């Protein structure tokens, strides 16, 4: 939910960046990835409900994509705020940006998660 609010904020208050086609493309890409992640999550939950099987490599994939999407959003938020302003929003966005860097590490680095996926799906 927080990611959707961040997307809405960026669309509404992106200011001069909304004039930049590359920046809008990046914003659109993150939005599409977030929607795809939500749909995938719902599919996994539905399959678990129907079959009673515990999640497998799905959880690792969700963790990887989720952290990548969060990092992409915070990068866009950082670009959309004026770091020189020093206002509460700019400070909060900088803190969030730095905090999101660690999400690829906790709960197992994304590289470890990729190894888990390879082992579970390919039997490596």
Which residues are covered by each model-predicted region?
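Alpha-helical interface subdomain recognition
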Residues: 1-124
